[in-house]
Each structure stands twice: as structure tokens, then as C-alpha cells.
């Protein structure tokens, strides 16, 4: 089939690679404009754009798809996108972590007679965790399960009917990085399955989302990553794993900011000394045991400013037990 693809990060790139490998023709790729990133702040293409360039797929990078924009440049980009999509022959549109809302007039083009509409890969069990950061929010909340939904898109925020749903257990030591990779692979497989069903002329059953259980996965802010040690050990552990790799949980040690990358719950009954929230109680083989508002957390991996990730014991032990990890304010 001929597919229009819209996506930006690596999660989306896995899907477009799988669609291409399955023999479908990507006739047009939408992706976000190049962004400055890295230490040199050089312009970098998105993973989806890099793939499209390799395969000579036409690319559009509008800043908005809304032709009503008051910004003349953005409005012109949206006009170009609308005209290009209207002129091209395609069977379906696939949208994965694109970063722009598709207005109804764009969806209408994909739903013209002979076309199958627009499909989205969403990394949660809808209607739980609609929105921008479903992977991180699921771990932060301590969810035991998540999954992937293939959704027939409508104009709402992740409100469309689901056509395929697969559940996945969240491992006890899961980070957003590891869960991202598992869900990206699952999503890529599912969208290929969905397109194969459509190509065979079969009808996929559309299931409206439940009215109950709706939650929203708001975009992750850097300020959320600062650890408040008066929280319970379980809450802090979930945050450390949720914010790995971005933005990285943060605390303050001996006057400088550090990143916390990995942790696990400890048996608080095993410690003879009890400190205040944020106190370093003692050291294990690799980790440092930190008193929390409730319970004890073993922090396993840290990173000093400008340094590499290292075992927390190696990071803190030169300072000694009794040091305090502090809550501090990060700027956005």
C-alpha cells in the first residue's frame, strides 16, 4: 500500500522502518523541523527525516498544520502541507509521535473514498495516559501494565477508536529507556499487522475508548526531575526510573548538582541508624542507602556534572556517610 507517514523521534523511526521493510511504499513523510541539539547546538534532523533521506522519500517539515495560523510563514507551510497531501495518491496515513495536532481538514483528506484514514501508534492502554509522555507517566505512577494501541484517529487528543491493543507488563526495574525500546518494537509490529489486514481487504473492528479511567500524560518538565527526599522511597524510585533518560532525576550533593540514574527499594528494617530525609545512611557493594520520608532507597548509579555515569558508592563514599542529598530548584 501507499502510506503517508508522520513522525519524529526514534520511536516513530522504528515504525517507518518496519512499514518500509514490509513492502509498503512511503510516498510522503511529515516530521518536525530540524532542532538544535548537543553540546555544539548544531541543527539535527529527526530520526524519521534521516530515514526518509536514505530512502529518497519526499519530506515536509511544517511548524504547524493549521492554515489559520496568524504567522505568515507558518501559514504558508501549512498551506503547502495541505496541498501536497491533497495532490498525492495514498491509501492510509500513519502518525507516530509526530508532535503536531492533525486538524480535521487533514484527517478529512485521509478519509476520502478509497482510503483507510489515519492510524496512530500510542504507547499506553488508552484511555489511560493520553498525551505526550505515556511511557514516563506509567512508570512514575507505578503502573504494573502498559501496552500499545493502534488507534483510528479523530480530531481529539488520543480519543479515537482503537483497532488493535496489546498489553505489556512493566518490569520492577523498568526505566523509561528500556520500556521505550520494548514498546517501540511492539508498536512497529502492530502497525504492520494493521496495514496487512487493510491490504487484504478485511475490516478491523473499531472499539470506542472507555469513558472511565481517562488520565493525561503531560509533557515532562525539567523541574519535575528534582528529587524531594521527603517523599517515600517507592515514589522516589519510580521517579528516578521514569526520568531515565530524560531529563534525569537530580539532587544536590556537597554543593553541586548530580544526576540519579538507577535505584531500588531497600529493606529499611535492616538499618541500625535512622537519619533525616536525604541522609546517606551507609554503603552497599555498589550503591548508597538514602533515608527517604518513608523507607530507604538504594541509589545505584549517579553522575557528577561533566562526568560519566558511575556507581553511587564511588560517587559518594569519598565524602562519607552522613552527607545529605538536598532538594533544590531547577530552572526550566
UniProtKB/Swiss-Prot annotation:
CDD domains: FMT_core_Met-tRNA-FMT_N (cd08646), Met_tRNA_FMT_C (cd08704). Keywords: Protein biosynthesis, Transferase. Disulfide bonds: none annotated. It is an enzyme of class 2 (transferase). One of its GO terms (cellular component) is cytosol. Belongs to the Fmt family. PANTHER family: METHIONYL-TRNA FORMYLTRANSFERASE, METHIONYL-TRNA FORMYLTRANSFERASE, MITOCHONDRIAL. This is Methionyl-tRNA formyltransferase. The gene is fmt.
